[in-house]
Amino acid sequence: MKVLVTSAWPYVNAVPHLGNLIGSILSADVFARYARLKYGKENVVFVSGSDEHGTPIEIEARKRNIEPKKLTDQAHAYDKKLFIDTWKISFDNYSRTESEVHKEFVRNFLVKLEKYIKVEEDEIPYCEKDKLFLPDRFIKGVCPYCGFEDARGDQCDNCGRLLTPRSLVNAKCALCGNPPVFKVTKHWFFDLSEFGDKIRDWISSSSTMPDNVKSVALSWVKEGLRPRSITRDNMWGIPAPFAGAENKTIYVWFEALLGYLSATVEYFKNLGKEEMWKEFWLYNDTKTYYFIGKDNIPFHAVILPAMLMASNEKYNLPSVIAATEYLLYEGQKFSKSRKIGVWIDEADKLMDVEYWRFILIRLRPEEKDTNFTWREALRIVNTELNDDIGNYANRVLSMVKRYYDGVVPSPKEAIFNDEDKNLITLIKESPKRMGELFELGKIKAGSEEILKLARSGNLYLNNRAPWSLVKTNKEEANNVLYISVNSLRTLAIMLYPIMPTYSSNLYQQLGLSNLESETWDSAGSLKIMPGHKIGEIRSLFKKIEMSPEELMKKLDEIRREVEKERPDLLR
């Protein structure tokens, strides 16, 4: 079994905020770490990269009178360092759309779609003031379906409908606010209409695709798929490979979708195993996981599968598209201009990154929009991490140290009572249930299993009271602490995908080394044997002794300093 894990490619014109992070890259990382324990490191590849082409970058470069690549080089390096060094994202390859491997792959791939490519003249919005053909996203207006006043020329963020610049009411240039004119120009179109039935049959028959993804994809098909332009008139992008399209570039959405393939190709090319990428894209025993935000569902559930089908290469179609709803910030949408939210280069200076990783997974908006509040973030850290998990670990290890000189006692299975057996069953079943939920893209739901086990362990200690049993019934005390110590090993493995450093810390306190050598399937086993010596005990987590108001004030101070350090493009 091979597993390909992907996350939506962040566009380099802004530092990702917490909502961006949980919607794609962090969720993908947590799943990838789980998958490596489940299927073996050699069978899992996790790829993503920087999306850096298109008009927004071209415009910023024009303002600064420099080459676009100079801007994106800085932004790509900044984001990559943030993800890998700060947020501990375990990419196998974090690529970029300026990669030569990517550009070559895209051009070769699109040539293969020739049967489904047609050339048409189209009226494209043009801003006479800015002297620029305007991409769909640089046209703003009123959605004709729901009346949303800030709809874009390609899609309404409010109702999710696909739009065209012509369909917008009171369309305006997003740069200067002037109404655009429409100029006739020739463009190349991918004929999506050829794939409606195939997309419907594929998505309907999937037993692993989440309902929200199925709903959006089937709605698109029902409304009727139409040809989509795959070329643009801007200069900053991959030159179109079609005859007669010498002054055109490939629409960023089409080429960015192919980044999942090119990043895999590039990864194995760098390893000197140039053909191995095919095992992850062309072999039947591969599962492919895409972690995205809900606004990207149509591109991943309709356009990408259609492109893969059209290539006739028998590429694997997505197994699971895990699309989150929106994460709000104190009841509002994240907004860079209004400074509403927290950005990932600020968050790490406010509290430990792995605390943030846990907070965001616990708030992951899997079924509906979720509201981030400082009060809830504090509750998650101080109650769930410290009280439920950390306190349980400390209680167990301290008693082993105190009553058994740090040596795990020998159990007597013949006298296990129902409470003993119930916790053993939970130890065995919790990783299994967590894994099953993860495999469906339900990362937050899977994380619940960690807390269920920790809370059950705490309750078990309270009910069995080993501090009393050591005086009255040593054999039963032995059983309680033997089972409890083993539950901590299970907890450490389950916590690892979310908090790799803290879980390894707990693992080491158990007197074990190299958590990454464990397997997920063994997580539910009682593998810590009698006579095993535990390690040095220390508090696993610390409570945050600040109020929400104090945290927000500190964030403002941090923000002023961080903004000075960002590359030009990201300020």
From Swiss-Prot:
Compartments it resides in: Cytoplasm
GO molecular function: ATP binding; metal ion binding; methionine-tRNA ligase activity
InterPro entries: aa-tRNA-synth_I_CS (IPR001412), Anticodon_Met (IPR041872), Met-tRNA_ligase_1 (IPR023458), Met-tRNA_synth (IPR014758), Methionyl/Leucyl_tRNA_Synth (IPR015413), MetRS_core (IPR033911), MetRS_Zn (IPR029038), Rossmann-like_a/b/a_fold (IPR014729)
Cofactor note: Binds 1 zinc ion per subunit.
Principal location listed in the UniProt entry: cytoplasm
Superkingdom field: Archaea
UniProt motif ('HIGH' region) ranges: 10-20
Binding site for Zn(2+): 143, 146, 156, 159
Motif residue range(s): 'KMSKS' region: 333-337
Record-listed ATP binding positions: 336
CC per GO annotation: aminoacyl-tRNA synthetase multienzyme complex; cytosol
Pfam family, one: Anticodon_3
Catalytic reaction equation(s): tRNA(Met) + L-methionine + ATP = L-methionyl-tRNA(Met) + AMP + diphosphate
SUPFAM superfamilies: Anticodon-binding domain of a subclass of class I aminoacyl-tRNA synthetases, Methionyl-tRNA synthetase (MetRS), Zn-domain, Nucleotidylyl transferase
Cofactor dependency: Zn(2+)
Record keywords: Aminoacyl-tRNA synthetase, ATP-binding, Cytoplasm, Ligase, Metal-binding, Nucleotide-binding, Protein biosynthesis, Zinc
Enzyme Commission number: 6.1.1.10
Biological processes annotated in GO: methionyl-tRNA aminoacylation
Main function: Is required not only for elongation of protein synthesis but also for the initiation of all mRNA translation through initiator tRNA(fMet) aminoacylation.
Family note: Belongs to the class-I aminoacyl-tRNA synthetase family. MetG type 1 subfamily.
Xref: PANTHER family: METHIONINE--TRNA LIGASE, METHIONINE--TRNA LIGASE, CYTOPLASMIC
UniProt-recorded name of the protein: Methionine--tRNA ligase
Originating gene: metG
